[in-house]
Amino acid sequence: MDRVAGQVNSRRGELLELAAAMFAERGLRATTVRDIADGAGILSGSLYHHFASTEEMVDELLRGFLDWLFARYRDIVDSTANPLERLQGLFMASFEAIEHHHAQVVIYQDEAQRLASQPRFSYIEDRNKQQRKMWVDVLNQGIEEGYFRPDLDVDLVYRFIRDTTWVSVRWYRPGGPLTAQQVGQQYLAIVLGGITKEGV
């Protein structure tokens, strides 16, 4: 019985991975159950054995990704000594997500605003608010403790970091000439060059 359950879970994971790649490449509205089933070499009805709809697949993909991301963020905030190191950790965790959860990041970037209006995806707006608070708190702490310039508009800096980081998923491809860590380190150097206090 456990072996059968393991095979079902493994197949479910394979189908989710395939669906994620298709959603990221084509968009949610342009990807049908039939497309995913064809890509998996199964009949559409067989896909319904695993998932009730494409929305269920998207929900599982986004929830899993956001749960992973926020666990990483929380670990960094809870275990890192100072605001500068916390900011660096959050920044690099975001690029880690782009490397290892590329399709989910693309889906999130392309579809989150539209999906957030649906009750099933109400958690997206909650996560956006949590993310903003986490980053803004770190920036404010950095100003208070003398790591970051006191004249910064924290909300503007947060928006810049968020948009600069996550939009890189548009051009960055895992397995290309640069790793996400290399890109993240370059981006981080640019950001820190603009926000850190002289002498830090």
Please describe what each predicted stretch is.
Residues 60, 74-104, 154, 158-161, ...:
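Hydrophobic alpha-helical connector segments
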